[in-house]
Amino acid sequence: MIRTTLCFASVLALQVALAGTAGAAETAKAVLSDPDGKEIGTVTLTAVPTGVLLNAELTAFPEGTHAFHIHGTGKCEPPSFKSAGGHFNPEEDRHGLENPAGPHSGDMPNIHVPANGKLHIEMMNQMVSLPGLLEGEGTAIVVHKKGDDYISNPAGDAGPRIACGVINE
């Protein structure tokens, strides 16, 4: 009963927070493609008072742990996706959620894809704003082959980029 009440209270608090931005809520979307150009997921980004809420629907992803980052350039040229640049890092912090001199604004937790290749995730990034992600050269969501170790510079030893999507209004 207590667990149910706490769960309901958490959902209600999130709905109230999002309702406070209704009408004024800004959203953006990134369509993720693999190195062959096949669409394999979408990420919807919603501005909330404390940052950006990311809601991802992934399909046809390889099983395993993968780094999931915001990169600093809004380009996704296959097959390497190097055109997306490094992690979004306007404050020029060190890389890594576990780094005392970090993290980059684009650092986010790893994702864990099951054997069927499908995953729904929601996560908050309190280090970014939607207008900040859309200005200048824009930004992109990038998924790496391996998980981020949360400390190595410059990118967490996460391996090659396996998916990329430009963040657009």
PLM-predicted stretches and their roles:
Residues 20-169:
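N-terminal leader/targeting pre-sequences
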Residues 7-19:
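Bacterial N-terminal signal peptides
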Residues 1-2:
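N-terminal secretory signal peptides that target proteins for export/translocation
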